[in-house]
Amino acid sequence: MLIARNLSCSRGRRQILSGIDLTLPAGEMVGVLGANGAGKSTLLGTLAGELPGDDAAVSLCNRPLTDWPVDELARSRAVLPQSPGLGFDLGVTEVVAMGGYPFPEMGKHTLDTLLDRALALADVAHLATRSYQSLSGGEQQRVQFARALVQVLACRTADSYRALLLDEPISSLDPRHQLQLLGTARNLCHTDALAVLVVLHDVNLAARWCDRLVLLADGRTVASGTPADVLTPPNLATVYGIPATVMESPVHRGVPMVVFG
């Protein structure tokens, strides 16, 4: 399990995260919410081992994250950054196949099967013969999601812990693909026992798809728990600085729906 205990992080004299506690168990999807500059991406990057935080504040499978070699870490977690750049052009299938790089022992047939599954799950199979640079921003985002899926699904031993860390993965997607991506991530929590952490701005999508939410403000946890426990008018006003009305979704029973303003 990925665990943060009293995690703090600073850049120069600026404190970005302070005293964050978070657990990410297998089979659960956790959403991170907050206004711009709240520390959401820094939290995800620190949990991924890509940004420095307090030594030993983060552990993966009962081992400090700082003790994990990069190649071993890549076999246990996959990261979809907010702006996944690619400085050179490759075919879509080549980009998705990058997710298999941490697994050199994987045979071609196994990789091809995994590629087909990831391309279908991300709804980019029809783009497989295209060049990456020819795609729209939303299409590129889905291709990168497929790459992360290959990486996180490649390790399939019975006792393996696998975390999928997604930083604003729907920022360039149309409504259909937003629902599809989040639904895919949620389904994989259940079918493949993945642990998923996702940074989002849409509180209603977070409420619908996430098992738990973490609400941040100024690098601190304002609330953590179920969507119903976290998405309250006082919490939302504290974080976003505007009034909020919370009601039950008329479409999804038991799911809170937030209206701002």
UniProtKB/Swiss-Prot annotation:
Where is coiled-coil annotated?
Answer: none
Instruction: Give the Gene Ontology MF terms in alphabetical order.
Output: ATP binding; ATP hydrolysis activity
Q: Does the keyword Translocase apply?
A: yes
A Pfam family assignment: ABC_tran
Q: What is its EC number?
A: 7.6.2.-
Q: Which UniProt keywords apply?
A: ATP-binding, Cell inner membrane, Cell membrane, Membrane, Nucleotide-binding, Plasmid, Translocase, Transport
Per UniProt, ATP binds at G34, A35, N36, G37, A38, G39, K40, S41
Its GO CC terms are:
plasma membrane
Boundaries of every ABC transporter domain copy: 2-243
Q: Where in the cell is it found?
A: Cell inner membrane
The stretch of residues making up the signal peptide is: none
Which PROSITE patterns does the entry link to? ABC_TRANSPORTER_1, ABC_TRANSPORTER_2, HMUV
Topological category with respect to the lipid bilayer: Peripheral membrane protein
The record's similarity note reads: Belongs to the ABC transporter superfamily. Heme (hemin) importer (TC 3.A.1.14.5) family.
Query: What role does it play?
Result: Part of the ABC transporter complex HmuTUV involved in hemin import. Responsible for energy coupling to the transport system.
On subunit structure and binding partners, the annotation says: The complex is composed of two ATP-binding proteins (HmuV), two transmembrane proteins (HmuU) and a solute-binding protein (HmuT).
In Swiss-Prot or TrEMBL terms, this protein is called Hemin import ATP-binding protein HmuV
Q: Which species is this record about?
A: Cupriavidus metallidurans (strain ATCC 43123 / DSM 2839 / NBRC 102507 / CH34)
